[in-house]
Amino acid sequence: ISGTVNDSIYDGKYRTSVYLKTKGQLKSYILSGLNNDNVYVDFKLFDDDECRKNIKELADSQNVTATLPYIITQSQNRIFGSLIENIRSCNIEMFLVRNLEEIGCLGNLGQKTGFVPKIVTDAGLYCWNSFSVLQLRDIISVCGCELTRITLPYELNYKEMNMVNYGVRTEFVAERFVPVMISKQCVRKTYGLCDHNNGIIYLNNKRSGTYMVESVCSFCHSVMYSAKRIDVGYDSSLLEEINPDYIRKDYDNM
């Protein structure tokens, strides 16, 4: 892994996060000896015995947060419960959530098993101003969880991002392909390519380029990503204007 976010890039002014999505990225990160304030590990890796062993070892020395799917349905409660069991077996109690349903499910599971889930909201959850952040914090508390920080929405400009705080830590995504559509419809299934395994295909658009579409078969939905990767690099004036607590870089399946 090269170009990992680290304190030397940001002069120690900001905490740093990285998002590992594949087994290869996880192995490379561990072997590199790099250290960040937070490491996100994609939920799909928790299905693999070897990955769970590596994740548990990583969690002994660094803060690890498990990401969760973009969509879960009532019929997937058992699958979701098994996923949380695998995550908890790695001594992880912090989760990057993508929807309100996951917060409710985590709260129920936490009450049954005696732990308080710590929540990091992803950029897709509604946190567009301080009032919505307060409302979300109340919802999370009622569910028996604890709001740790929020990821700033992509739709906000830099001045608006600076106004979203109210005592809650914020995270700014500096590098990644942005999810532009999340759907229960499956492109691979439409093309007759469904093999019930998580996978990626590419859609070519003459005007806007190539889009990566990730099939999340374990929870039966797909995620289309932007054709171009956002990369703000180290723009000190921009970061000072946003003033986030964390800066995040996502490694992608490209």
Question: Where in the sequence are the language-model features?
Answer:
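Active-site pocket-lining/capping segments in soluble small-molecule metabolic enzymes
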Residues: I1-M254
